[in-house]
UniProtKB/Swiss-Prot annotation:
A molecular function GO annotation: histone deacetylase binding
Gene this chain is encoded by: rco-1
WD repeat segments: 295-324, 342-372, 384-414, 425-455, 469-499, 523-553, 565-600
Inactivation phenotype: Mutant are aconidial, female sterile, have reduced growth rates and form hyphae that coil in a counterclockwise direction, opposite to that of the wild-type.
CDD domains linked: WD40
Biased composition (Low complexity): 164-177, 190-209
Start-end of Pro residues biased regions: 144-163
Protein's name in the database: Transcriptional repressor rco-1
C-alpha cells in the first residue's frame, strides 16, 4: 500500500474532449458532404425527368403528326376510291390484285381505318343465308360451280370486255357463266372500326361485304344440272337424284359447311327466316327458339343484357336502345342531343351497371357516356381516349368501368369521382375488354393477336399468346363465371379457352408467364367477332362474320348446334345472366342486317 494518494493527470480530460470534438466535426462534415451529394442527385434526377418528359412530348407530337398525316392520306385515298367507284370502276393501272380467302388481311384499328365499314356501308343490301335454290334454277357450264346468290339471280352483266377491270374482279356475285368459283371476300372485317365514316364504302374493297352462303358439303354435287354431252355424267346425275342425301362429313364441327337442303330432318330445324343445324356426331341436348325480332334503322353493333335479365340494350347509329325481354317492347332511346347531327356516330359498346340504374355507351367520338336510365340524362362523360372506343365493361361493384380503344390503351374509370384511375398501354389497338367477376382483373384483346390480363393496380399478370395462341387479331374476350378461365375469339376463325394459371398481382421484372390454352374451337368459316359463356358455364357462344351463332361444349370442344338467323354478320352475341323457368336461357344477337334478335335455348 502506497503512502502517497493517487491523483489523476491534469491534462487527460482536456485531451479526451478535444478528440471527441474532432470526431464530431468529422461526422458533421461527412453528413454535410452526403447532404450535398443527395441534393446534387436530386437535382440531376429532376433534370433527367424533365428531359425525359420533353422527349415523351416530342415523341407524342411526332406520333400525332404521323397519325394526322396517315389519316389525311387515307381520307384522300378513300375519297379517290369513292369517286372511282361512283364513275363505274378504276382504270386498269389501279386494278388491285385479286384477294383469295387464305390471304385476307384485316385492316388495322385505331389509326384511321374502318373495320366495320363493309357492314355499315351495306345496310339492308344482303339477303338471309337461305338454303341454296334448286339446281334447275341455276344452269351453269360444266366447269363452274353454282353461284352463291345473295338475293336471287342477279341481272346479267355486260361482257367482260366491256366491264372496267375493277368490276371484273371486285364486284359481287355475277350472272351465269361469268362468276368466279367463290365470290371475293371483303378484306374489311365487320369488327370494331377506325375513325368516322362508317356509312361510307371501305377504302380497299366493295361497299357491301360479299359473305358466302353455305357451301355444300363434300358428299353433295358441286355443279348445277346441264345438257349432257356424254352418257356417264348423265347417269351419275340420275344416280345422285335417286340416292338419299350422303351423311355429314367426318369433321364434327364443320356445321357451317353443310347444306341444310341435303340434311335429314332430325338434325335440322327450318323456320321462315332462320334455321338450325344440329351436330349429328354428338347427342342433341339443346333446342333454340326465336323470341323477339328488334328492328333497327341501322347496323346493330352491340347487344347486352341487364344483370337481372329483364332488359336488353342495343347500340346502333347515334343511339342506344333498351327493350323489355319479356314483351320485346322498346322502353327508351338514349341519344345525346348535343352532338353534331351530320354524319354517323355508331355506338360500339353498351353495358348496364350491376344495379341496372345506368347504361354506359362507347362511341366513335372517343367519349364514354354513362346514362341515368330513369331520367334519360347523362350522368358522366369520360374524356381521354384518342381514338374510337370499341368495348366497355362494368365491374360487379358498379364502381369501375373499363374501356378499350384503338388508341392502344385500356383505361379504368371511377364512376363516383369521374376520374381516369389507370391507363394500360399496349403495342396495338384494343378491340375488347372484360372485368373478371371478382373485380380483381381486367382482360383485353388486341390487334397484335394476344390477350392480356392485368390486375386492377396495373400489373400485367398474363399474356396469352404463343404457339397455341391466336394467329390473327383478337376481337372478343369473356371471363368464365368463376373467373378461372377466359375465352377469346379471333379473326383466325377460332375460339380459344384459356386456363388462367399464372401467379397474379406480383410485380416482376421478368416477362409474365401466360396461361394455358386448354381448348381450341374450330368450325366457323369466317372471322369470329363475339364470344361469351352461359351463366352456368355449360356452353360457349360465338358469333361470326359467316352469319352463324354456334354453341360449343367447353368440355369436349364439339359444337352442339349452329344457328343461322341473320342476313349479315353476327357482330355481337350476349347471353342473359339469368336462367328462366324450367331452365330456359336467353341470348341476344346483333347484326349488320339492322336487326337484333332475342332467342331462347333449353335442354331437351
Amino acid at each position: 500500500m502506497s503512502m502517497y494518494p493517487h491523483r489523476p493527470i491534469a491534462g487527460a480530460p482536456i485531451q479526451n474532449m478535444g478528440r471527441l470534438n474532432e470526431l464530431l466535426d468529422g461526422i458533421r462534415m461527412e453528413f454535410e458532404s452526403q447532404a450535398r451529394q443527395y441534393e446534387t442527385c436530386q437535382h440531376d434526377l429532376a433534370t433527367q425527368l424533365q428531359e425525359l418528359q420533353v422527349i415523351r412530348e416530342k415523341v407524342f407530337q411526332m406520333e400525332q403528326h404521323q397519325m394526322n398525316v396517315k389519316q389525311k392520306y387515307e381520307d384522300e385515298i378513300a375519297l379517290l376510291r369513292r369517286q372511282l367507284e361512283a364513275r363505274g370502276g378504276a382504270p386498269g393501272n389501279m386494278n388491285p390484285p385479286p384477294q383469295h380467302p387464305g390471304q385476307q388481311q384485316p385492316p388495322a384499328i385505331g389509326l384511321g381505318s374502318n373495320v366495320f365499314s363493309a357492314i355499315m356501308a351495306g345496310q339492308g343490301g344482303q339477303a338471309l343465308v337461305p338454303p341454296p335454290p334448286p339446281p334447275q334454277q341455276q344452269e351453269q357450264p360444266a366447269h363452274m360451280p353454282a353461284p352463291p346468290g345473295l338475293q336471287g339471280p342477279p341481272p346479267p352483266p355486260p361482257p367482260p370486255s366491256q366491264q372496267p377491270p375493277f368490276q371484273q374482279q371486285y364486284q359481287g356475285p355475277q350472272g351465269p357463266g361469268n362468276f368466279p368459283p367463290q365470290p371475293p371476300q371483303s378484306t374489311a372485317s365487320p369488327g370494331p372500326a377506325g375513325k368516322r365514316g362508317i356509312g361510307r364504302p371501305p377504302a380497299g374493297g366493295p361497299a357491301t361485304p360479299q359473305i358466302n352462303t353455305p357451301i355444300p358439303y363434300n358428299g353433295g354435287p358441286a355443279q348445277s344440272p346441264q345438257v349432257p354431252t356424254h352418257p356417264t355424267p348423265d347417269h351419275t346425275r340420275m344416280a345422285q337424284h335417286h340416292q338419299p342425301p350422303p351423311p355429314p362429313p367426318s369433321q364434327t364441327n364443320a356445321l357451317s359447311e353443310l347444306d341444310p337442303d341435303r340434311l335429314p330432318n332430325h338434325i335440322k330445324k327450318m323456320k321462315d327466316d332462320w334455321w338450325v343445324i344440329f351436330n349429328a356426331a354428338v347427342p342433341r341436348v339443346l333446342d333454340v327458339e326465336l323470341v323477339h325480332t328488334l328492328q333497327h334503322e341501322s347496323v346493330v353493333c352491340c347487344v347486352r343484357f341487364s344483370m337481372d335479365g329483364k332488359y336488353v340494350a342495343t347500340g346502333c347509329n347515334r343511339s342506344a336502345q333498351i327493350y323489355d325481354v319479356e314483351t320485346g317492347e322498346k322502353l327508351c332511346i338514349l341519344q345525346d342531343e348535343n352532338i353534331d347531327l351530320t354524319g354517323d356516330l355508331y355506338i360500339r359498346s353498351v353495358c348496364f351497371s350491376p344495379d341496372g340504374k345506368y347504361l354506359a355507351t362507347g362511341a366513335e367520338d372517343k367519349l364514354i357516356r354513362v346514362w341515368d336510365i330513369q331520367s334519360r340524362t347523362i350522368r358522366n362523360t369520360f374524356h381521354g381516349h384518342e381514338q374510337d372506343i370499341y368495348s366497355l365493361d362494368f365491374s360487379r361493384d358498379g364502381r369501375t368501368i373499363a374501356s378499350g380503344s384503338g388508341d392502344r390503351t385500356v383505361r379504368l374509370w371511377d364512376i363516383e369521382t369521374g376520374q381516369n384511375t389507370s391507363v394500360l398501354s399496349i403495342e396495338d389497338g384494343v378491340t375488347t375488354v372484360a372485368i373478371s367477376p371478382d373485380k380483381q382483373f381486367v382482360a383485353a384483346g388486341s390487334l397484335d393477336k394476344s390477350v392480356r390480363v392485368w390486375d386492377m393496380r396495373g400489373y400485367l399478370a398474363e399474356r396469352l399468346e404463343g404457339p397455341d395462341g391466336h394467329k390473327d387479331s383478337v376481337y372478343s374476350v369473356a371471363f368464365s363465371p368463376d373467373g378461372r378461365n377466359l375465352v377469346s375469339g379471333s379473326l383466325d376463325k377460332t375460339i380459344k379457352m384459356w386456363e388462367l394459371s399464372a401467379p397474379r398481382g406480383i410485380p416482376s421484372s421478368a416477362p409474365p408467364k401466360g396461361g394455358r390454352c386448354i381448348k381450341t374451337f374450330e368450325g366457323h368459316r369466317d372471322f369470329v367477332l363475339s364470344v361469351a359463356l352461359t351463366p352456368d358455364s355449360q356452353w360457349v357462344l360465338s358469333g361470326s362474320k359467316d352469319r352463324g351463332v354456334q354453341f360449343w361444349d367447353p368440355r369436349t370442344g364439339h359444337t352442339q348446334l349452329m344457328l343461322q338467323g341473320h342476313k349479315n354478320s353476327v357482330i355481337s352475341v350476349a347471353p342473359s345472366p339469368v336462367t328462366g323457368p324450367n331452365g330456359v336461357g336467353y341470348f341476344a344477337t346483333g347484326s349488320g342486317d339492322m336487326r337484333a334478335r332475342i332467342w331462347s335455348y333449353s335442354r331437351i
